[in-house]
Amino acid sequence: MIVTYGTVGCPVSRGGSPGCGRRIAEELRLAEDARLRLALLGRCIVKGSPAQARGELRAELKAIDATIELRKELDAIDAEWAPKIELSAELRAIDAEWRPAIRLRSAYRAIIGRIELRKELDAIDAEWAPKIELSAELKAIDAEWRPAIRLRSAYRAIIGRWELSKELKAIDAEWRPAIARESLRKELDAIDAEWQHAITFWHISRAIIGSIELSKELKAIDAKWKYVAIYERQKAQRRREERAAKAREELRKELNDIDAKWKSASAIKLRKDLRSTSEGVDHTEFALELRATDKSGNMELVLKLKATDTKNQHDAIVKAIEDGFVGYAAECGAATRELNACGGMSTTSAPSTDLISTVVSAVTTGTGQQQSAGSESQRPTECGGGGTLLSSLFALILPSSNWYCNAVLYGGFLGCLGS
């Protein structure tokens, strides 16, 4: 077992004696440690190997050298601090010699302080003596008047409570209607909530009874005015029928007059030609319709041409119709001028008069175009190549709003093509 010891410095006090005591204790400890180390070293030498013993011996020698050096340092410190240690011993002796005098001086100072404090307190008491006496008198007065003061406080409390009670009563009187209204409102709300179903049923029953009574009154009124309403409707119906009959009669008279004027020899000849052409062609039908309405006075002319024999006879039929229209257009123009000169078409406006001349020019132009086209154009199977000419003619005639002019033309067509 190897034990290593290190050097430890000795703390030395600069005051003298405390440091010397610690140094002596340190030396004693070091001597005891050296003795123990030597004893341990002897046991190690006896029990251990020579090499181990030499190592431990070397370590012990180093420790002894360190102890010797420490001893030298401590001796130097002791030599340095020896005068101070001696001075400290002298000062302690002086302190021990003067300690009774120091105690006496401290007691003297305490006595002097108490005497001065007593003087100051006596001066303060002399200054405050009147105030203290006055305070004693006031305390005596307070003790004497304490029952009266208590009575006064109780009286003030009673007066305050009385005034507060008055104010509260005034506030209650002011707010009593509002409080009563609020209470009444709550009671009424509770009653309404309780009787809500009954009130709803009552309203429904009143509504049903009212509707029944109203229905009875309306039925009575209807029964009272029933015949009056029927009479008024019949009267209005008769008036409308009379106006319609009068209008139809007037229209019939005017149309008869127009038919009587326009049944000329040329119209009869054209009609006969068309009939002969129609009779010579099988499966061909012609129809001319004249329709008149009472509301706007417009008249509609419908020319129906149906040709089922499309091989040879169609062109001849269309050509005959176009020739007849060309001749009849000239007749219409002359008749229109004659009527204008005689005043027979005084209600005819200028656009309608221009319409007749436009029809004449359209028929003439269409005929020329058909003749120049010749056999180059392929004609359709129904309504033929004259469909364009006829469509142009009826498009110019039919939309006219002046029924007098249309009646002139329609009467002429009826005279030419009618049965």
UniProtKB/Swiss-Prot annotation:
Keyword Signal recorded: yes
GO BP terms in the entry: biological process involved in interaction with host
Localization, UniProt: Secreted
Gene for this chain: aaaP
GO function terms (MF aspect): actin filament binding
Stated name of the protein: Appendage-associated protein
Source taxonomy: Bacteria, Pseudomonadati, Pseudomonadota, Alphaproteobacteria, Rickettsiales
Gene Ontology cellular component terms for the protein in this record: symbiont-containing vacuole
Coiled-coil region list: 232-262
Top-level taxonomic group: Bacteria
UniProt key word Signal: yes
Keywords, ordered alphabetically: Coiled coil, Secreted, Signal
Signal peptide: 1-39
Biological role: Associates with actin filament appendages that are formed in the inclusion appendages of the parasitophorous vacuole during infection of the host erythrocyte.
